[in-house]
Amino acid sequence: MQDIGFELEGEYVELNQLLKLCDIVDSGGAGKALVASGAVRVDGAVELRKTCKIRAGQVVELEGVRIAVQAADG
């Protein structure tokens, strides 16, 4: 499984945008489609809300990829 660390700049990032920012998908629309397919898990549970707010400390998993979201320093 590929591990990706994502440094969160604000309070949260929308799930579909996180997938785009981590180069999992090419666009926010593709991210929405991937989430809608049921292929994405947040903290171990399937997440179907495309714009679910992902905050520091959460883990997103899909298709052999694990994204650990961390707060930005400072």
What are these regions (language model features)?
Residues E47-G74:
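C-terminal structural segments of small proteins and small subunits
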Residues V13-A56:
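A basic, amphipathic helix-loop patch mediating RNA/tRNA/ribosome contacts
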Residues M1-V13:
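A detector for short, charged/polar N-terminal pre-domain segments
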Residues Q2-I4, G38, V65:
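Generic structural motif recognizing short loop/turn segments at the entrances and edges of beta-strands
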